[in-house]
Curated annotation (Swiss-Prot):
Natural source organism: Methanothrix thermoacetophila (strain DSM 6194 / JCM 14653 / NBRC 101360 / PT) (Methanosaeta thermophila)
InterPro entries tied to this protein: GTP_cyclohydrolase_FolE2/MptA, GTP_cyclohydrolase_MptA
NCBIfam families (UniProt xref): GTP cyclohydrolase MptA
Official protein name in the record: GTP cyclohydrolase MptA
Annotated family: Belongs to the GTP cyclohydrolase IV family.
Pfam families, alphabetized: GCHY-1
Quaternary data: Homodimer.
GO molecular function: GTP cyclohydrolase I activity; GTP cyclohydrolase IV activity; iron ion binding
Organism ancestry: Archaea, Methanobacteriati, Methanobacteriota, Stenosarchaea group, Methanomicrobia
Record's catalysed reaction(s): GTP + H2O = 7,8-dihydroneopterin 2',3'-cyclic phosphate + formate + diphosphate + H(+)
Length: 322
């Protein structure tokens, strides 16, 4: 075969290192095996990058898609159980393919279908969850791989502040109607009190090193349980009543959601090392405000464990002054 010129290997006009060069929007089918269950087939979006030294005009971008295809073909005979593991293998293959690179990065996003039942009528349904994984590999005699896996889940929250304002107004109105204090307190404890709601988007990403793996289903469950209520694609009338009631009996600020995720992550992932980095994020899309509410915590597992271990020394804060 006639040897063609390698323009990418030429010297650039300005010899400057580039942090990331690669391709985005690469769609591939990924099959993930599950122990004792049918495998999951994901339509996944990949982004792959390498760093570029100042001596090269460009990167050989075709090698990026070749690296993805090679790893996916190899995994047909060797099942993949974790998406972050797959990204890690692709990142290492990129370093093999790009001999001039010292760092490779792979990002993968997919829509994952989870099976659920409606809360009251128990009808089987399917819900879509966004999942993602990343891997960063560095070259050397003993290549180092850092992996991230996570998910974003939609739920609903009910505002505690507005609810307390409405509760106080209801208390005054009921007193004016002649009800006793005891009857009013019993009523307000039993009946969901009106407030405004938000569509919440909670996300968790966990960074682990080398061969540690994190089950994605556990992450999804934690996010779902860290808001006022889950939401569903299908709701019959009894389900709708139950979801609304649950949400208003469990009001949460955006900050509450992140703190709830934090304590659930610590309780669930006892096997993770203290240096595993966790990013917890909540965005609540407001219904009566023009802005959205945001909260985030980035910490190592050891830091979260230490904070929760000291919680018994803390006294609950008093009631807010309205």
């Amino acid at each position: 075969m006639e040897r063609l010129p390698d323009v990418q290997a030429c010297h650039p006009a300005y010899p400057i290192n580039l942090t990331r060069v690669g391709v985005t929007g690469v769609k591939k089918l990924v099959k993930v095996e599950r122990s004792g269950e049918r495998p999951i087939v994901l339509i996944s979006n990949f982004e792959v990058f390498v760093d570029l030294p100042s001596s090269r005009k460009g990167a050989n971008l075709s090698r990026n898609t070749e690296a993805i295809d090679e790893v996916l073909e190899e995994e047909i005979s060797r099942p993949v159980y974790e998406i972050e593991e797959l990204c890690g293998k692709i990142a290492l293959r990129l370093l093999e393919r790009h001999e001039y690179a010292t760092r490779a990065e792979v990002k993968m996003k997919s829509e994952y279908i989870v099976k659920r039942q409606t809360p009251a009528t128990r009808v089987n349904c399917q819900e879509v969850v966004d999942i993602f994984a990343e891997a960063m590999a560095t070259s050397g005699p003993d290549p180092h791989v850092k992996k991230i896996v996570g998910a974003e889940v939609i739920g609903t929250t009910a505002c505690p502040c507005a609810q307390e304002i409405v509760r106080e107004q209801m208390r005054r109105d009921l007193l004016n109607l002649g009800l006793s204090e005891d009857a009013i307190e019993g009523f307000l404890k039993k009946v969901p009190v009106a407030t405004h709601n938000q569509r919440g988007r909670g996300s968790i990403s966990i960074e682990v090193r080398d061969r540690k793996c994190v089950p994605i289903d556990r992450i999804i469950r934690i996010i779902e349980e860290s808001m006022s209520s889950k939401v569903y694609g299908l709701l019959k009338r009894p389900d709708e009543a139950l979801v609304v009631s649950r949400a208003h009996m469990n009001p949460m600020f955006v900050e509450d959601c992140v703190r709830e995720m934090a304590q659930r992550v610590v309780a669930t992932f006892v096997e993770l090392p203290d240096d595993a980095v966790v990013t917890l994020k909540q965005i609540n899309e407001e219904s009566i405000h023009r802005h959205n509410a945001f909260a985030e915590r980035v910490a190592k597992m050891g830091e979260l464990r230490a904070e929760l271990a000291a919680i018994h020394e803390m006294q609950p804060c008093g009631a807010s002054q309205m």
